[in-house]
């Protein structure tokens, strides 16, 4: 069975309408339950997938805009914006760990997907060192997908060596069907970034912000040619470029509000009116592959 938990009951009820339809379509045998009660939700839970945005998207926009106003990076994972978001998130994340310790199965695992990943990971390690929690980010896998497109191969054919903390890591070796293709990839990325013809045709890279991100990888490789970077290094190593690129009147948070959030609200309205929706837009995308 799958439980959906949120502290915002109104939002929970609306989101659950979409989730019910997706579950019905993809896994009809799965029993879906909705709750805002901690004890009811977490009792005997085995796996807890956590993704919390403390303060909501409106606070994300504030983090971005206040930071940019002062010439700082406002991105949700790092810089001034990430630090502000992290300070809001650490407390609730520690509370979640304590709730799971109290109610969940003794062998529970929390798979934490909440940003800022590195800050939250360090905080949970420090404050709850024995917690059964895995702090993850899917960006390394997404970069691997770009590599596969560059090499014109399937992602499953790649084997990589990677080190670092969540978003901030480096690929030290990449093999394709057993062949070391690290230098080949370095040469491509140094000239084009993590962009290929296939990437331009990919829905993710049609987004100008993502195209800018993947293209920026070439600058990083030319600065540090030993390894292939996770794209999040741009926020540390290309800070001035990022601040200049970001639009204080059209931040990523605002784009999400006007994009995914708007689509979700429109879908909920249709479901409330008994209409059908295109469920494929709510299937797994770049996040959670």
Describe every region a protein language model picked out:
Residues 1-63, 74-78, 82-156, 166-171, ...:
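Metallocofactor- and cofactor-centric catalytic cores in central/energy metabolism, strongly enriched
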Residues 69-71:
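Short amphipathic alpha-helix adjacent to the substrate-entry channel of hydrolases
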Residues 152-289:
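Long, compositionally biased stretches enriched for glycine and/or charged residues
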């Amino acid at each position: 069975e799958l439980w959906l938990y949120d502290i915002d009951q109104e939002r929970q009820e609306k989101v659950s309408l979409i989730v019910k339809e997706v579950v019905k379509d993809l896994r009809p045998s799965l029993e879906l339950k909705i709750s805002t009660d901690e004890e009811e939700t977490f009792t005997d839970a085995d796996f807890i997938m956590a993704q919390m945005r403390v303060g909501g998207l409106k606070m994300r926009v504030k983090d971005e805009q206040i930071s940019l106003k002062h010439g700082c990076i406002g991105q949700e994972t790092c810089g001034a914006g990430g630090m502000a978001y992290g300070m809001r998130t650490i407390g609730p994340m520690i509370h979640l760990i304590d709730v799971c310790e109290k109610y969940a199965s003794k062998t529970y695992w929390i798979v934490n997907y909440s940003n800022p990943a590195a800050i939250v990971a360090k905080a949970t390690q420090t404050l709850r060192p024995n917690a059964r929690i895995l702090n993850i980010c899917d960006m390394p896998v997404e970069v691997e997908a770009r590599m596969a497109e560059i090499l014109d191969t399937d992602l499953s054919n790649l084997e990589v060596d990677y080190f670092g903390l969540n978003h901030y890591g480096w690929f030290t070796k990449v093999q394709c069907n057993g062949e070391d293709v690290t230098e080949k990839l370095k040469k491509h990325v140094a000239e084009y970034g993590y962009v290929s013809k296939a990437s331009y045709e990919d829905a993710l890279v049609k987004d100008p912000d993502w195209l800018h991100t993947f293209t920026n990888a070439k600058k990083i490789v030319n600065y540090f040619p030993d390894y292939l970077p996770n794209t999040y290094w741009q926020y540390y190593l290309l800070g001035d470029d990022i601040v200049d690129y970001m639009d204080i009147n059209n931040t990523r948070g605002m784009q999400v509000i006007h994009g995914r959030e708007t689509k979700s609200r429109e879908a909920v309205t249709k479901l409330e009116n008994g209409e059908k929706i295109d469920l494929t837009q709510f299937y797994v995308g770049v996040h959670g592959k």
